[in-house]
């Protein structure tokens, strides 16, 4: 096999690849052995028809396509290695005429990253915002704890107020017709939560237990159900229960109930410490992000569409994982939001292009600075992962695949590269 670059234009390269006649003959024999059981010729048992007889009956080219499929992957990969080419997308092949006993020639057009340089990445000026914890931040955390530990108390002597939880039955109508999905019994709803269609919850304020009321709403134009979008509807609602939130007292007893501390003062001190740690991490992470963005913004680089699409694919996988963690799927998300995959891809595109550029710039800097992931780096990362996932180190290692180790090393290199940039940046 031999290969050469025929043409190079912008970020497209056309390769000429030649597979020797002897090598192709071996592939033809493999194709014949794979297919011979499918030929039925009188006088021969199935799978015993000689190759020459098959070629005489069906033509010498009968095995060419399968033989080409056999030699193509290795020939293409060999050409990439020989010419030191790293494609960013699938190749486009063009096959010429194949003649028996002759070398086989074909071309492969591949996309590669456009050439670009990264300069001035050390000493770049970057803003660093310091986030500090205030007393009101601690109080907000305490308020969240009280909300989480509130009790819902049944109310019978007053009508519905904002913030109450109500238990209702409802039936929805458009005109005289009841619509699908518009009926429920013993449905819990917090007034002011905006869970329902705009205008629905507010009309329940003032209703009492046992009341039957009619709630008139207009579905939003962008509502996920096209049959209901923009239409006026009436809901017949029956109020069964009214409950109000009772917050616990903020005292030492509360601290004992919700934490390992004996006093409210100790709980507040712990919350303050955690908030300070979080603020410090936020300060550092935002600073590192600013450094990456500032360095990448200096680089003139048009990101190929194939790279952007690949980044969008990765972002979609991450989003799908997040949805599954919340008990949803992409399909249910599309239905709920009235969108399609192409809409979501469009929303992600700008961010995907930004991320792709930053990653390419970081990769180039790591090459220039000869940054590597040492055995010590990998060992420390594995120990950190074992602690995070609460696994024994040996068990964690046994579950890791080769590609997992590759990802770990790549992550270490990226982190060390950002460390280098952050340490050498000037805080403005």
Swiss-Prot record:
PROSITE patterns: FKBP_PPIASE (PS50059). It is found in: Cytoplasm. It is an enzyme of class 5 (isomerase). Belongs to the FKBP-type PPIase family. Tig subfamily. GO terms for biological process: 'de novo' cotranslational protein folding; cell division; chaperone-mediated protein folding; protein transport; protein unfolding. It comes from Alkaliphilus metalliredigens (strain QYMF). Consists of 3 domains; the N-terminus binds the ribosome, the middle domain has PPIase activity, while the C-terminus has intrinsic chaperone activity on its own. It catalyses: [protein]-peptidylproline (omega=180) = [protein]-peptidylproline (omega=0). The lineage of its organism: Bacteria, Bacillati, Bacillota, Clostridia, Peptostreptococcales. This is Trigger factor.
